[in-house]
Regions:
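N-terminal Rossmann-like FAD-binding beta1-loop-alpha1 element of flavoenzymes
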Residues: 47-76
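Helical element adjacent to the flavin cofactor pocket in flavoenzyme catalytic cores
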Residues: 163-164, 189-250
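Flavin (FAD/FMN) cofactor-binding and adjacent substrate-gating region
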Residues: 11-33, 100-106, 129-144, 149-211
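Active-site substrate-recognition segment that forms the wall
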Residues: 126, 134-142, 229-230, 246-286, ...
């Protein structure tokens, strides 16, 4: 008998299909300003390759590009299309270092390991910039991210972190900001201090992702879109099954992040999908624009549910805020994002949103990426916890290095202990929502 297609009910309980139509980009400012790019066919047959990559986000695209550069035959499968997921929907911040602050890494892993992790984080940001330059990707790549704090305790902690990076890691491009300095950059009384990091950067993430895809394709990578992987038969050579085709591969890279679903239970124990939301305002006049941001930088603040924002090239505010923890996005995305935005910028009360969209990322318990070799022929990288532009791009290169026998950085990243999330199956999301609600309540109360 032939293999049955997934039922409509099953598809609706899959984050790949819960909030979006097959193969269509979301109603985002990024999609509205996307560069001309290639489209790819659906897998319709059985093929063989050296490496099969599942997922066309930053991890998968970077791995494909670096493997192809080394002469490796690569097939990349995406359930929708390259750049469709979190890689094409996020805040576009290319953060410096790891998601976790260096002081905590030093305590948890020791100074030597912390330095190795710091260097990988540095290399990640540099990698993004080098790929943009090497492949002439037009994606508005610009320097500067501000970390903005609400409380004196947070400012004190940020001063400590900044001093540590300056003194012990030679980071001369990060500077502390006092209340006057930060309010001369950000037009909000909410923030009373923080730091600015000129080694960090921001970009148009969808155009970056599609630039990677086009470059990989030109180097010989076979990319297939609308090719949902529903099964992996593991062995000396894995067989990756889609509805209409199969791929036989010496190696497989699972690069699905928040859209993993039930494809691999070992990975799903380590990472949890959460939904995040962004809005793009109407075009702002010069006066209103300057009342928000006086520099062309990106901002991420100290809330547990982070607010992040920057100006677009056509003078809109791109503001991210709000999270959810189930399969479906909130019905009113505009209200979800407008609430935190007006707390920061009450002067935008009358400003309209032209675009609102959501996406799904993946977090780990420790907020560090989860890189693993699941068996001799299968790799995984996911759980970037909000720092995926740089680290997912780097993870793809690191997986490539290990496949080619250069395992130093993979050994460092895969040695990070990633605990399982509590609960099993249907209990996991409610438990996460309960924990996250506690932290959101702390945000509301100002802790």
């Amino acid at each position: 008998m032939g293999k049955r297609a997934p039922s409509l009910k099953c598809l609706k309980m899959n984050l790949l299909f819960s909030n979006d139509k097959q193969g269509q980009l979301p109603n985002s400012w990024y999609a509205a300003t996307v560069n001309q790019h290639k489209r790819y066919k659906t897998l319709q047959t059985r093929i063989r390759t050296d490496v099969c990559i599942i997922g066309g986000g930053f991890t998968g695209l970077s791995a494909a590009l670096h493997l192809a550069t080394a002469g490796v035959k690569v097939v990349l499968l995406d359930a929708h299309r390259p750049g469709w997921g979190a890689s094409g929907r996020n805040g576009g911040q290319v953060a410096n270092g790891q998601r976790v602050e260096q002081g905590r890494l030093e305590k948890e892993y020791g100074e030597l390991a912390a330095r190795s992790l710091w260097q990988i984080g540095q290399d990640a940001k540099e990698l993004v910039g080098s790929l943009v330059s090497k492949y002439s990707i037009n994606c508005d790549f610009k320097p500067g991210i501000v970390h903005a704090c609400f409380s004196e305790a947070e400012v004190k902690e940020e001063l400590k972190n900044t001093a540590n990076l300056q003194k012990n890691y030679g980071h001369s491009d990060i500077h502390s900001l006092d209340k006057t300095q930060i309010q001369n950059i950000i037009g909000s009384k909410s923030y009373i201090g923080g730091s600015i990091d000129w080694r960090s950067a921001h970009l148009h993430p969808l155009n970056f992702a599609l630039g990677l895809a086009d470059s990989a394709s030109e180097l010989g990578v076979e990319i297939f879109e609308n090719s949902l992987v529903d099964k992996i038969a593991y062995g000396n050579k894995n067989i990756i099954h889609t509805k209409h085709g199969q791929v036989e591969a010496n190696y497989t890279i699972i690069a699905c992040n928040g859209y993993l679903g039930n494809l691999n239970k070992e990975i799903s124990k380590k990472v949890m999908p959460i939904n995040n939301f962004i809005a793009a305002t109407e075009v702002l006049n010069d006066s209103l624009k300057k009342s928000i941001l006086m520099k062309d930088i990106a901002v991420a603040d100290s809330k547990f549910v982070v607010n992040y924002f920057r100006l677009s090239r056509d003078n809109r505010l791109l503001f991210g805020g709000g999270e959810s923890y189930g399969y479906k996005f909130p019905k009113n995305l505009e209200a979800t994002v407008r609430k935190p935005m007006l707390r920061i910028f009450p002067q935008l009360k009358s400003v309209k949103f032209d675009y609102t969209w959501g996406g799904t990322l993946a977090i780990t318990m420790g907020r560090m990426p989860y890189l693993s070799r699941l068996n001799n022929s299968t790799y995984s990288a996911s759980g970037y916890s909000g720092s995926g532009v740089a680290m997912a791009t780097m993870a793809g290169k690191i997986l490539c290095e290990d496949i080619l026998g250069e395992n130093g950085r993979f050994k460092t990243m895969s040695s990070i202990i990633t605990p399982n999330f509590p609960g099993r199956g249907a209990l996991r999301s409610p438990l996460l929502a309960l924990a996250m609600t506690w932290y959101k309540m702390r945000d509301e109360l100002g802790f």
